[in-house]
Every structure is written in C-alpha cells, then in structure tokens.
Amino acid sequence: MIRKIYDKLVESHNEIKNQIYNIANYLKQEIQDKVNEYWNEYVINHEQSETCKFVAIDGGSFGRPMRIGIVYAVGAESVIGDNKGVKTLSEDGQIGIFKPGNDAQERISLLMEALELSLALRDGSKGDYILMDGSLSKKIGNKVDIQQFSDEELKLIRNVDLNGIISIKDERKMRDLLMLLNQFLVSKIIEEYDGNVLWISKVSRGRDLFGTDYPDITVLELFTEKRGFSKLIIKNIDIEKISEIPEIEVLRKMEYTTFYTRLDNGKRVIRVDIVGRVDEKIVKEIMDRLSGVSIKGYPFPLLKAHMDVRFSAMDREKIIKLVGSKLHKDIEWWPSQFY
C-alpha cells in the first residue's frame, strides 16, 4: 500500500507543487495589503529585560485505556526565570484510575489544568509576569449548571479540594466540578495578578484578523519574517460560558486583548492574551521583556516547564507496570489480563 502512495507522489509531484504555489499566490494577492497594514515590525530594547522575572507554568498528562478503566497520570510545574537562568519552584501531580467513560480523557485534561492554575495562583507573586501555556478562553472552558451540586460539593470548589472532587462517584458531576473549579481558579488568578498574566499559545485557530480559511498565525508566519507584533484585538469573555456563582463574577465583565508577536527574526509567531485593554506601548514592553528570556523566539521558562512535565514513552510504560504490580501485590485474585 505504501509503495502505491510513493508512486502516486512521484507521478503527482509537479501537480502538488503547483497547487501549493497557487494557494500561496492566491493568499498573497488576497491579503498581502492587510498583512502590511496589521503587522508592525519592532526593534527590541534589550535594557527592559535585564531585571524582569517570569513565573511559567505548564502541565502534562497521559491516559491509557485498560480493561479495568483509564489509568491516568497528570503533573504540573512552575518555574521562575530571568536572563540569567531558570529554576523550578513547585511541582504537583495526581495518578489514578477512572472508570471507563466517554469523558475520561476530558476529565484528565481538566485535572491537569486545575493543577496548572493552582500553581499559578500560589507562585505567581514570585515574578513580574506569569506565563501560562494556552489561550485564556480555553482555560475558562464552558458554563456549568450549578443546580446539580449540593452545598457540600460547592464547598469543594471554594476550598480547591481536588482530591475531594476526583473522589466523586458520578463521573459527569466530577467533570462539571472540575470545569467549575477551573473557572474559579482563573477568576482568582485574574483578581490577584490582573494584567501580569500572559496566556501564550504556539498554535491558534483564530481568524479574527484576516478572516481567511487559514488561521491568522499561519498567515503571519507565511508573509512576515521580521520581529514584530500584530494589530491588537479587544475581546469580551463570552458570558454564555460563565457559570453562575458569585465568586467568578469578575469573568462576566472582563475584556482582554489578543495579539500575535514574533520575538526573533525568522522564528515562529506566538499568540498572547492579556486581561484588559492594552496599547502598543505595553505590547512593546512585553516584547522587550520576553525577548530577554527567549530562545529561538519562544520564552525559555515556559519551554523548560513544558519539557519537564512531558511523559516520555519510558515514563508511561513504567507507570503502567507499577500500577499492574501494585494490583497484583494488594489484590491477589486480580488477573493480569485486567491490565
């Protein structure tokens, strides 16, 4: 089968190349003027970055379907860094088994995000800026019907009791509690740190700038090369996604600014969300400061946290084996084929 595909590739090479050229040419004709209008080249002021400290947080997770359920492990780490180096601040993690269910992977992701947000709330005061991986809107998630929860279950949210939440027997209720917890934590982070939190995305599907079939970040990577930043986009949080508890009311009234930036010539474009209305002066200050801790156009503290929390193939296999040996040791009748 694969040989047939290779043969087709050889036969169609020129046709595919022409298709790529035609798409690029079409895009250039359609939006080059907009790119020129919306992209601002900028020369970094390196003096701004000398004393700035960044707290960066990222998380990692994996889940393995097994006959007994979904074995999962999640972790999160906060680091602090400046132009002299990066060191770890805090780590947290959870490991367990969820019963099989359609939303098991979603619960794993929500649990990882809760660990990230908890570390950000705790360690954010140690730096000048907090760097969070991913977009602000994704972290906020979707509205949860709070009528399904008892007062005791809502108390789990206010106490940030993760162990209590993942002990809930009803999987759907557990998922919704995790969603609500993440909204609660985002609101606390915003109340505490406001515009000092930068939500950074390497990948974005946003099309607010150019309105083409291609994400804005792709267009900017295709048609710009120099260090710079895009036109600023002011947005409101979608109130239809905000749950109805008073502790997260701040999210209902909140504006935030989105912009794209390239921190080094020829490197990747990243997306940045920041709470409030900011102007180009603030964007330039952010670029100046981020450039002091960036490698190949990406903030190194965030990259360090990302690399530290990744579960390698070896990590995954080791965890699965440990879970299996633990079951055998503690439950003698447990057959090996169950895991």
UniProtKB/Swiss-Prot annotation:
Enzyme type, top EC level: hydrolase
Cofactor annotation: Mn(2+)
GO BP field: DNA repair
Xref: SMART domains: NurA
Keyword Thylakoid: no
Residues annotated for Mn(2+) binding in this entry: D58, D133
Activity regulation information from UniProt: Nuclease activity requires the presence of HerA. Another report shows endo- and exonuclease activity in the absence of HerA; HerA stimulates the exo- but not endonuclease. LhrC-Core (Hel112) inhibits the exonuclease activity of the HerA-NurA complex on ss- and dsDNA, has no effect on the nicking activity of NurA. Endo- and exonuclease activities are inhibited by ATP; ATP may subtract divalent ions from the reaction preventing nuclease activity, HerA can alleviate ATP inhibition.
Enzyme Commission number(s) from the entry: 3.1.-.-
Keyword Lipid biosynthesis: no
InterPro entries xref list: DSB_repair_nuclease_NurA, NurA_domain
GO MF annotations, alphabetized: metal ion binding; nuclease activity
Keywords: DNA damage, DNA repair, DNA-binding, Endonuclease, Exonuclease, Hydrolase, Manganese, Metal-binding, Nuclease
Function: Involved in DNA double-strand break (DSB) repair. Probably acts with HerA to stimulate resection of the 5' strand and produce the long 3' single-strand that is required for RadA loading. NurA and HerA together stimulate the end-resection of six nucleotides of a linear DNA substrate. Processes linear double-stranded (ds)DNA probes with 3' or 5' single-stranded overhangs or blunt ends. Has endonuclease activity on single-stranded (ss)DNA and nicking activity on dsDNA without HerA as well as 5'- and 3'-exonuclease activity on ssDNA. Binds ssDNA, dsDNA, forked and bubble DNA equally well.
Quaternary assembly: Homodimer. Forms a complex with HerA.
Family the UniProt entry places it in: Belongs to the NurA family.
NCBIfam families the record matches: NurA_Sulf (NF041033)
Official protein name in the record: DNA double-strand break repair nuclease NurA
Organism: Saccharolobus solfataricus (strain ATCC 35092 / DSM 1617 / JCM 11322 / P2)
